[in-house]
Structure formats: structure tokens, C-alpha cells
């Protein structure tokens, strides 16, 4: 995980160009109008944090003295959960329910609880384990699959994401998903669920936006900075999210800032004074047809103020929500840190399909062999292997073995492995040197005539086709064809039946050509990078059955998988993500390099085949990379495939 803590003001200015490039707030005369008046004074409401309930006049308050309070529109108490609480966030849980998250001051534990807003009954609280740092703030996030997460913001840059619920319910126990490196002066956070975006303040520096999804990268982008590098006069404080925009407090200057999202940046709309408030610390908003309703807490007086802002952010176009398929098993994490696991290949045991194997490359170690339960069975430390492919029935001396071939970046060669057809044991079977300077991808082609060919590609776009031979007992390769693409390729897969080769050009798309050695290497576009397929184009796999054949592509740029017909005109059948399997404790898959798929009946949940994908970001818990095993039946059901 990479995190840059920007401390150099000149670097901030160079990075953002905010002072010169960001549109300045509207003039005060043209700014949206806001008038605040005290709220809850007659009921003597004192709260450290407050939230409005969408579609209702009721409010939820967190109080150090009185606990969690459900209040009516005038501040009168409707329900109470005793205790001492600070910091608050909530999400709906059905038409008459909500889930609240707050910090229990007595135990310094984040606490979640459901509330029926009709009967005013509290559910059983769920508490996170006590942390080894002081928790300053928290916020909830519900993803596209309706998994509920809690973010913790702590002192000295500590941050965490926890899985706490599914659908409308809290889980029986919270599960740690990942750690986050946050600014050391962070205290507040908010999440835009629809955009999967986490906002965090850095008091004396500015406001930051991070991807909220647990499978996303941890890169951050600025929303605004403290002067002279941005529009915040003195400080960055609490925030509130509206569709397409953000509201943020500058407590030291007693001002409210409005932002409109524009692409991947935020434009400052207005900076409004908050007269009568000395230190506005908390803010809660609810968007309505008439504008934006606000609640603001003044820390200096302890009073709460309400008002309506005659401004609404313009909703922005969001990426389409892709369906999610859960992995049923996952491999043991690889034995090397960083970008290590890369490409899987499925070997089908001809005698006992349930005893099939998943071979996986570790590009910092060698070849790994797993059972269908994900347990590591063999390690072959033969060098930095990148891609791997498998074909049955290779003649090696007097034996007939199944053959795995991997691209070896240490030697720029093809590493060959014999697979015992009875036991599944994998053994090195030789090397075939190539003239490639930086070998990357590899795939095999086995036409009906029985020969075995290997396609190897390099970073410079070259493809070399070798005819493999093992009759002498030692594997060898003869170069029979060469062609190239204009930029870096990697993934490839051959359709043995139709003698067609699919190749991926990472920043461009997928091509098809004749796989036969004697044929001209004429490239035909299958799919270009665009709205559905996002660079980098990585792993390619073929699902072949009696009903229909499909090409599966790793769309690394948006952590998804694209499915096409494997025959012209290569019709798009859909795209999906490999998501969280909370019940099994398996995280989703992201930043996938290689994949493989088979239609073979491997028994049990794999009776329609299996998809294996490399997971570039292992979460829940955070560990080294691994491979996720997905039942093809679930992919077919999700996309409506034959």
C-alpha cells in the first residue's frame, strides 16, 4: 500500500495548481443564501454530533452525558440508548429502520446499533474490538452489493475499514478488512456510497478523497487545500456529502464551503460565513427538492443551528453498477510480498476430476500447485515465472504426460513442467530459450493433428511461436512464426478447435488471428478498450462447452471481467466483478493479472466448471496476493449465459 503524506507546500502547489486553476467561489452577492437559527433550544438539546433522518423530521444525536438519542423535530426525546457517545453516522435499514454507528467514550470502542424508528426500539449493539490507537472519528459506507462497512479515523494517521453488516442487518461480529494510511491530523470522514468515495479531512492542510471500496487502490486526490494553496481560509473540518457535491466546514474561520464534483476534481462553488457561530464543528445535511437542509453544531456554545441552503449540487454520471459473483474458495497467499502472484492454469485430472489442480505463477519465486480447496500442495522455486498454460497428452521420451509451460523472466525462456496424469505431481521438464529481452506472456495451442505450440510474447510487442517436441526425452522448441503488436501485450489464449488465437494488447484491446504456424498473422479486432473494457487488458481465458463458447477477459482498469462470445462477431454477453463472500470470509478480487477457466465437471460446486482469477489486493485479512476460485455456474446465472 502506497501513501504519500504531502508536507512540502511547494509540492502541494505543484501537484494541485489550486490557487491558479481551481475556479474560485462565487462572489458573496451571488452566493447561495443560508440563514441559520437555533434548534432544540427549548428542549435544551446538547449533543456532540447530530444526524437528520432522511424523509423525516426526526434526528439522531450522540451525547457524552445522555447516550444515543432519537429526537423529534423540536428536539424532544423519543428513545434513548444510555451511555456516553461521540461521533455519529447512520444508514437506512428498511423503510422504518436505521443503523447507527458511534464511538463509546467509556470503552473507546466503535459501536453499531439498529433502531426501529416506528417502535423506537433499539437492537443489540455490535462493538468493534478496542483499538491500540485513539479513535477520533468514524463513518459508514454501503457498497453496490449492499455490504455495510465502517471506517475508523485515528490519531497519527491510523485508519481502518471493517465489515459490519449486509443488507439491512448488522453482522454477528465485525471483521477487519484493511488498514488505511490517513493524514495524521485527520478527525472526520464521510462516504459517498453511490460514488464509492471516502472523504477525510487534514485539519491544517485540506480535504482529501479516497476510493472507499475495499478492493480499490489507496490513492488519494485533493478536494481543496488551506490557503494559500486552496480556498480554505484557515482549516479543514467536518464534511457532509450530497449527490454530486460536498459541504465542508472551516471551523477556525467559521465558514461553510460548497463543492461541485467535475470529473475527477471538485470545483469550489461558494464560501459562506456562519454569523453567530464561533467554532462550527459538526454538520449534517439532507437534500430536498427545495434545497439542502442543514444542522450545524457550534462547539464554542454547544448549541445546534438549523437552516435551509438554496443550493443543490448537480448529480454526476456514475459508472454502471456491475453484478457481483462471489468466490467460493481461495488459495493460500503466496510466499512473497508485493506484486507476486500473476497467472493461474487449471489442470483437469483425467481420472478423478475432483483431484484436479490449479497451477499459479509467483513472479518472485516460481510455480505453485494448489488443490481445489486452495491448499498449497507443491512449490517449485524455478525463478520468476509470469504466465502459465496447460495442455494434455505431450510425448516426453517414452512417457505421455500433461504439460505446463510458463514464461520465465529470469532466463527469458519457456519453463516446461511434466504433470503426472495419475497423481497430479508436477516436475520440471526443461527449458526453451528465446531471444526475447523481456518475456511476458505465454499460451499453448494444440490442433487436432496433435502438435503442441507455445506462443511467447515480450514487452516490446513481439510474439514468437514455437513447436514443442519431447520425443528425445528432453523438451525442445523450434521457432516457426513471428509477429508483433504495436505496444505491450501479455495475456493470450488459443481456441484449439477453431485454430484461433486471442491476444491482449494492454492499452488497446483484444485481437484474434489464425493460430496455425503457416498462416499469415493478420490481426482482427475483437474488442477495444473503452466503456466496457478498461486498460490494462490482462488475462484471457476460454470457456468451451457443448452449448456455447465464451471468451473471458480481465479488465484490470475497473477490477472487472468481461465475457464475449468466442466466435465472430464476438458479441458482448456482460461484465461482472468477483465480490465479497462474507459468509466464507473471502474478500473479492481486484487488479487481476491472469485468469483461467474450464467447463470440465470438477464435482460439487464446480459441476459446470471453474473460473480462477488472480487477486492483486488481498483483504480480510490483508495478506500477500492469492487466487480466487469461482463456480462458473454463478457466472452463468449472473449473466444469463447458456
Task: Describe the role of every protein-language-model region.
Residues 2-10:
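Bacterial N-terminal signal peptides that target proteins for export
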Residues 22-642:
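Sequence/structural signature of beta-propeller domains
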Residues 13:
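…; additionally, a secondary subgroup of soluble metalloenzymes is captured
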Residues 17-20:
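C-terminal motif of bacterial Sec signal peptides marking the signal peptidase cleavage site
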Amino acid at each position: 500500500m502506497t501513501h504519500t503524506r504531502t508536507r512540502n507546500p511547494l509540492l502541494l502547489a505543484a501537484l494541485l495548481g489550486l490557487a491558479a486553476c481551481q475556479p474560485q467561489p462565487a462572489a458573496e452577492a451571488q452566493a447561495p443564501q443560508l440563514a441559520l437559527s437555533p434548534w432544540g433550544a427549548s428542549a435544551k438539546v446538547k449533543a456532540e454530533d447530530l444526524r437528520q433522518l432522511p424523509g423525516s423530521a426526526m434526528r439522531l444525536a450522540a451525547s457524552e452525558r445522555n447516550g444515543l438519542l432519537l429526537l423529534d423535530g423540536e428536539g424532544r426525546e423519543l428513545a434513548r440508548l444510555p451511555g456516553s457517545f461521540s461521533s455519529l453516522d447512520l444508514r437506512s435499514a428498511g423503510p422504518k429502520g436505521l443503523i447507527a454507528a458511534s464511538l463509546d467514550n467509556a470503552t473507546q470502542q466503535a459501536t453499531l446499533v439498529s433502531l426501529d424508528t416506528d417502535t423506537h426500539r433499539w437492537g443489540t449493539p455490535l462493538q468493534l474490538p478496542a483499538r491500540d490507537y485513539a479513535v477520533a472519528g468514524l463513518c459508514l459506507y454501503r457498497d453496490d452489493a449492499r455490504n455495510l462497512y465502517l471506517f475508523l479515523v485515528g490519531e497519527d494517521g491510523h485508519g481502518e475499514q471493517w465489515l459490519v453488516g449486509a443488507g439491512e442487518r448488522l453482522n454477528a461480529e465485525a471483521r477487519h478488512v484493511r488498514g488505511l494510511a490517513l493524514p495524521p491530523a485527520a478527525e472526520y470522514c464521510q462516504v459517498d456510497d453511490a460514488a464509492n468515495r471516502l472523504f477525510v479531512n487534514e485539519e491544517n492542510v485540506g480535504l482529501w478523497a479516497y476510493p472507499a471500496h475495499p478492493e480499490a487502490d489507496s490513492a488519494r486526490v485533493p478536494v481543496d487545500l488551506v490557503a494559500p494553496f486552496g480556498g480554505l481560509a484557515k482549516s479543514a473540518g467536518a464534511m457532509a456529502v450530497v449527490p454530486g457535491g460536498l459541504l465542508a466546514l472551516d471551523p477556525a474561520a467559521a465558514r461553510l464551503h460548497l463543492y461541485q464534483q467535475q470529473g475527477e476534481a471538485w470545483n469550489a462553488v461558494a464560501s459562506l460565513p456562519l454569523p453567530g457561530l464561533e467554532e462550527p464543528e459538526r454538520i449534517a445535511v439532507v437534500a430536498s427538492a427545495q434545497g439542502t437542509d442543514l444542522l450545524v453544531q457550534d462547539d464554542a456554545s454547544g448549541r445546534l443551528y438549523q437552516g435551509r441552503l438554496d443550493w443543490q449540487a448537480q448529480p454526476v454520471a456514475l459508472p454502471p453498477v456491475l453484478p457481483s459473483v462471489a468466490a467460493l474458495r481461495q488459495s493460500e497467499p503466496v510466499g512473497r510480498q508485493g506484486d507476486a502472484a500473476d497467472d493461474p492454469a487449471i489442470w483437469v485430472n483425467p481420472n478423478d476430476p475432483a483431484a484436479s489442480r490449479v497451477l499459479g505463477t509467483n513472479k518472485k519465486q516460481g510455480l505453485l500447485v494448489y488443490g481445489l480447496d486452495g491448499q498449497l500442495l507443491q512449490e517449485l522455486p524455478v525463478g520468476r515465472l509470469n504466465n502459465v498454460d496447460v495442455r494434455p497428452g505431450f510425448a516426453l521420451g517414452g512417457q505421455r504426460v500433461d504439460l505446463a509451460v510458463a514464461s520465465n523472466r529470469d532466463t527469458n525462456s519457456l519453463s516446461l513442467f511434466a504433470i503426472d496424469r495419475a497423481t497430479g505431481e508436477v516436475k520440471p521438464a526443461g527449458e526453451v530459450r528465446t531471444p526475447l529481452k523481456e518475456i511476458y506472456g505465454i499460451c499453448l495451442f494444440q490442433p487436432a493433428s496433435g502438435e503442441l505450440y507455445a506462443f511467447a510474447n515480450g514487452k516490446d510487442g513481439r510474439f514468437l511461436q514455437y513447436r514443442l517436441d519431447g520425443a528425445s526425452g528432453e523438451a525442445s522448441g523450434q521457432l516457426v512464426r513471428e509477429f508483433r503488436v504495436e505496444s505491450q501485450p501479455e495475456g493470450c489464449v488459443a481456441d484449439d478447435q477453431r485454430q484461433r488465437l486471442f491476444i491482449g494488447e494492454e492499452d488497446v484491446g483484444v485481437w484474434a488471428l489464425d493460430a496455425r504456424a503457416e498462416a499469415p498473422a493478420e490481426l482482427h479486432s475483437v474488442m477495444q478498450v473503452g466503456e466496457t473494457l478498461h486498460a490494462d487488458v490482462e488475462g484471457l481465458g476460454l470457456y468451451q462447452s457443448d452449448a456455447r463458447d465464451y471468451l473471458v477477459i480481465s479488465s484490470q482498469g475497473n477490477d472487472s471481467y468481461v465475457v464475449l462470445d468466442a466466435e465472430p462477431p464476438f458479441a458482448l454477453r456482460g461484465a461482472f466483478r468477483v465480490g465479497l463472500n462474507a459468509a466464507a470470509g473471502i474478500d473479492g478480487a481486484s487488479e487481476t493479472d491472469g485468469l483461467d477457466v474450464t467447463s470440465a465437471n470438477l464435482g460439487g460446486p464446480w459441476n459446470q466448471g471453474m473460473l480462477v482469477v488472480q487477486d492483486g489486493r488481498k483483504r480480510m485479512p490483508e495478506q500477500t496476493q492469492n487466487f480466487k476460485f469461482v463456480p462458473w455456474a454463478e457466472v452463468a446465472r449472473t449473466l444469463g449465459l447458456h
